[in-house]
Amino acid sequence: MGTLILDSMVNKEAVLREAPPGTILVTVGDVTSERISGFGMTPLLQIIDGKTRRAAHEPAGPPPDVEIIRCENPAGGISPECIETIRRALGSSSPLRLVVSGEEDLLVIPACIYAPDGAVIMYGQPGRGLVAIHVDAGIRYKAKGLLDSVS
């Protein structure tokens, strides 16, 4: 699901083509969240777990206007707690950083379900680049099917 921006092509302009100013943006993954923040962009929701490719990663501190929230999520799964936390976070008007105890990889799925139409979810594809998912009813339907298969 989504559009791949190759690693060699990831820059602020490429990201802005996918998520122009005013777009609700969600980032999933430590490196993706740091890259987007490094371009001077503040996602509505950053989902991180303090790991990159399963190795410990010390995330950069969030900007002062970004509130930290937390949830626990098992590796290879999606916890009801994280689903509810993401649902509530995407109803917020203030930027949030969700720090996951466990693994955040599959949390792109509930982000796609609860983000509004027109939102963009970005996550990293290791060794390939950055994936941008443009949320609409079709993406939401696919994400719900994936959630059912994981649950």
Curated annotation (Swiss-Prot):
Belongs to the GTP-dependent DPCK family. Pathway: Cofactor biosynthesis; coenzyme A biosynthesis. Keywords: Coenzyme A biosynthesis, GTP-binding, Kinase, Nucleotide-binding, Transferase. Transmembrane segments: none annotated. It holds the Pfam family DUF359. It is an enzyme of class 2 (transferase). Its EC number is 2.7.1.237. This is GTP-dependent dephospho-CoA kinase. GO terms for molecular function: GTP binding; kinase activity. PANTHER family: GTP-DEPENDENT DEPHOSPHO-COA KINASE, UPF0218 PROTEIN TK1697. Catalyzes the GTP-dependent phosphorylation of the 3'-hydroxyl group of dephosphocoenzyme A to form coenzyme A (CoA). GTP binds at residues 30-31, 49, 51, 104.
